[in-house]
Regions:
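Short alpha-helical DNA-recognition segment
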Residues: 15-33
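A short, Lys/Arg-rich alpha-helix, primarily the initiator
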Residues: 1-20
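The DNA-recognition helices of helix-turn-helix-type DNA-binding domains
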Residues: 28, 39, 64-67
């Protein structure tokens, strides 16, 4: 399972809020909603967020192996 909980922490650390991502940087509200729910997002979107936040992927996402 991929979790994007670290995204919100990184945003705070970088001084960028939800409103700025959507208005200044053009990140769609639906993308942020999908991430908040833990749903699928494209690698393009992850790359875009890493560039905006000037961070690495591990700063916005974590992988946890699903229990079988």
């Amino acid at each position: 399972m991929i979790s994007y909980d670290k995204l919100w922490v990184t945003m705070e650390e970088k001084g960028i809020n939800y409103y700025q991502l959507t208005t200044k940087y053009g990140v769609s509200k639906s993308l942020l909603s999908r991430m908040k729910k833990g749903n699928w997002v494209s690698t393009h979107s992850l790359n875009m967020l890493c560039n905006i936040l000037d961070c690495n992927l591990e700063d916005i996402a974590t992988f946890t192996k699903d229990e079988q």
